[in-house]
Amino acid sequence: MARQMMTVGCLILIVVLLDMMVPVFNTCPGQYDECGNGPEEGECCGTHNYCCKNACTTYHHCHGGRDAGKLLRSLKKLKLTTH
């Protein structure tokens, strides 16, 4: 029984140590996240970017959304062309 408890304790210790080592491998400073697994591997995403499809980009660009300014201009254009 003591041998099993020692084995479980060692496994838990190994998992904890590996979990603590993960941030060491991130080469990006501060709050920047590391992203990419291709030619740009290890690219650091800035504060306004995040990792999307293994590349640093903005939320808008990643999800193909439209910002409020573009939407407003398109509505104004539509209103001008319908009169």
UniProtKB/Swiss-Prot annotation:
What does UniProt give as GO cellular component? extracellular region
**Calcium listed as a keyword:** no
Question: Where would one find the signal peptide in this protein?
Answer: 1-27
Which GO MF terms are attached to this record? potassium channel regulator activity; toxin activity
Instruction: Keywords in alphabetical order, please.
Output: Disulfide bond, Ion channel impairing toxin, Neurotoxin, Potassium channel impairing toxin, Secreted, Signal, Toxin, Voltage-gated potassium channel impairing toxin
Tell me, what does this protein do in biology? Acts as a neurotoxin by inhibiting voltage-gated potassium channels (Kv).
What protein does this entry describe?
Turripeptide Lol11.1
The top of its lineage is: Eukaryota, Metazoa, Spiralia, Lophotrochozoa, Mollusca
